[in-house]
């Protein structure tokens, strides 16, 4: 699109509406994850899509292992993209890692975001005693890292159907494709960054209205995490319980998710 950051992250703006809507994908996918959700919004919004630096669709030379040790660098990328497009106000839909990135960005620049819609969001994946159930023990996480390191292909083949959750073979194939597109060392590095992060302390600083979308069964994010986030986010927040399974409803139930997004955006 003419500037280095927009070209580097394959930024696209689709649609003809007056307002901006950002779709930011999560770990293991790229912007194509939104392809069956996108058509529902191009009449009402200018929709901004981009690829995270870790996506297989981005030149891996852009991934600086020293810089991307925390989500702050992903926040920098998001804000630089919006500034390059001269966006002054937008609604934001973030999945997984990008849900938390959106929250961090809203703390830095609250005036930029009218609403955050957070899909499969978690501020902390590890359990913390009796006070917080993130879904994983440290040993389980280390086992995941070891499996990724030992045989990435085998790990993807096992992980993709578990993450999708629902019995939707096309979604499993699509998620597997984008996982395989990632360079394995980058995939492992990002996994370590995400699973070892603890962003519970920033929730109270988020004052932009939030809608937390939580599926019926998500192997990565227990339902209790959605409730925890609602209770700790500083501003107005709601939980929208989705009548579908898995961590990737935009792949497994795109038309249903699009309808739920329309409801959230209208409120």
UniProtKB/Swiss-Prot annotation:
Q: What class of enzyme is it?
A: hydrolase
Tell me the GO molecular function terms. Answer: hydrolase activity
- What keywords would UniProt list here? Cytoplasm, Hydrolase, Nucleus
Q: Where in the cell is it found?
A: Cytoplasm; Nucleus
Q: Which domain of life is it from?
A: Eukaryota
Q: What happens when the gene is disrupted?
A: Reduced plant height and extensive vegetative branching from both basal and aerial nodes.
Enzyme Commission number(s) from the entry: 3.1.-.-
Phenotypic consequence of residue 28 to D: In rms3-4; ramosus phenotype, reduced plant height and extensive vegetative branching from both basal and aerial nodes
The positions flagged as active site in the entry are: 96, 218, 247
One short Pfam name that applies is: Abhydrolase_6
What the record says about family reads: Belongs to the AB hydrolase superfamily.
Query: What function does the entry list?
Result: Involved in strigolactone signaling pathway. Functions downstream of strigolactone synthesis, as a component of hormone signaling and as an enzyme that participates in the conversion of strigolactones to the bioactive form. Binds and hydrolyzes the synthetic strigolactone analog GR24 and its enantiomers in vitro. Forms a stable covalent complex with the D-ring of strigolactone, which is essential for hormone bioactivity. The D-ring is attached to His-247 of the catalytic triad.
Task: From the Swiss-Prot or TrEMBL record, give the protein name.
Answer: Strigolactone esterase RMS3
Q: What is the lineage of its organism?
A: Eukaryota, Viridiplantae, Streptophyta, Embryophyta, Tracheophyta
């Amino acid at each position: 699109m003419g500037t280095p950051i927009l070209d580097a992250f394959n930024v696209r703006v689709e649609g003809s509406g007056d307002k901006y809507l950002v779709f930011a994908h999560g770990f293991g996918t790229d912007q194509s994850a939104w392809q069956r959700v996108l058509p529902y919004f191009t009449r009402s919004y200018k929709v901004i899509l981009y690829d995270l630096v870790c996506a297989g669709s981005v030149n891996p030379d852009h991934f600086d292992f020293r810089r991307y040790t925390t989500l702050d660098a992903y926040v920098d990328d998001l804000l630089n993209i919006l500034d390059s497009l001269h966006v002054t106000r937008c609604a934001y839909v973030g999945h997984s890692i990008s849900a938390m990135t959106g929250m961090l960005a809203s703390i830095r620049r609250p005036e930029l975001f009218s609403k955050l819609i957070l899909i499969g969001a978690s501020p902390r994946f590890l359990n913390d005693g009796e006070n917080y159930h993130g879904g994983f023990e440290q040993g389980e996480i280390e086992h995941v890292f070891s499996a990724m390191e030992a045989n990435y292909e085998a790990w993807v083949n096992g992980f993709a159907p578990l993450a999708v959750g629902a019995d939707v073979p096309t979604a499993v194939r699509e998620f597997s494709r984008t996982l395989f597109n990632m360079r394995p060392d980058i995939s492992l590095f990002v996994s370590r960054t995400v699973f070892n992060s603890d962003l519970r302390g920033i929730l109270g600083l988020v004052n932009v209205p939030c809608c937390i979308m939580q599926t019926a069964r998500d192997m990565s994010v227990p339902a209790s995490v959605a409730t925890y986030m609602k209770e700790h986010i500083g501003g107005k927040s709601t939980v929208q319980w989705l009548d579908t399974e898995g961590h990737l409803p935009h792949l497994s139930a795109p038309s249903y998710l699009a309808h739920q997004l329309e409801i959230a955006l209208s409120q």
